[in-house]
Design a protein with these regions (language model features):
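Alpha/beta catalytic barrel-like cores
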Residues: 1-106, 116-119, 124-129, 137, ...
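A broadly tuned preference for mixed-charge, low-complexity surface segments
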Residues: 114-124, 159-168
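Eukaryote-skewed repeat-based solenoidal scaffolds used as protein-protein interaction platforms
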Residues: 133-214
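Conserved, mostly hydrophobic/aromatic
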Residues: 111
Length: 214
């Protein structure tokens, strides 16, 4: 049996701030507007360095499934990774993490939040979803992972918007839209059913979406 957990390691993070090991350091919008990508870069570097520590902690306890935080790069929707002052160091750390994960058979995944919605009738939401999902995939790329469902990026369909068939059609169109999702993002992409009967069941996803997206 394999064990895993999601995002926050309570043992390592529930300690005095100076000793805290966590991957979701962020800042409020006012701070971001004042300090910009320099501060975002510093926090992202601290987050990936701590991600490496968390995986080593996991390995010592035979924990090899880990869902990573979606907040590794603070305010990632507001800049490109390549513009970060520390991106070269961040890349090296992520590559090292990827090698460690492969060598020790760790499976790493992502589950972006509910604001990621390819089925949204609002194009602005869809565009933000493209960037969010592609950003997650780029982290895996920087780790050196071959794109597959083994390093999955898992989301929900979202709402039904009063018509499941039309929503499914819109989802499929947005999934395939040129210039939207990167190829590697599509190869890592998975959908999860909802718990509520009125939302998206496993059968709904299989019947209405799977056959058109794979």
């Amino acid at each position: 049996m394999n064990y895993g957990y999601a995002c926050i390691n309570m043992t390592l993070s529930d300690v005095p701030k100076s000793k805290r090991i966590t991957t979701n350091r962020s800042m409020i919008k006012r701070t971001f507007l004042r300090e910009g990508i320099q501060k975002a870069s510093e926090l992202a570097l601290q987050n990936v360095l701590d991600l490496e520590k968390i995986l080593k902690w996991n390995e010592q306890r035979d924990i090899r499934f880990y869902r990573m935080s979606s907040d590794i790069f603070p305010w990632a929707s507001e800049y490109e990774y390549d513009d970060l002052p520390d991106i070269s160091t961040i890349r090296r750390v992520l590559a090292r993490i990827g090698e460690y994960a492969v060598s020790n058979a760790h499976r790493l995944t992502f589950h972006p939040g509910p604001f990621c919605c390819l089925a949204s009738p609002k194009q602005s939401v869809v565009e933000k979803t493209y960037k969010e999902l592609n950003n997650h995939s780029r982290i895996f790329d920087m780790m050196g992972f071959f794109p597959s469902h083994y390093n999955k990026i898992n989301i929900h369909v979202g709402g039904t918007y009063g018509d499941k068939d039309e929503t499914a059609k819109r989802f499929i169109e947005n999934f395939h839209k040129p210039g939207g999702l990167d190829d590697n993002t599509k190869k890592r992409f998975t959908l999860e059913n909802d718990d509520k009967e009125s939302m998206w069941s496993t059968k709904d996803i299989y019947d209405k979406i799977y056959h058109e997206t794979g």
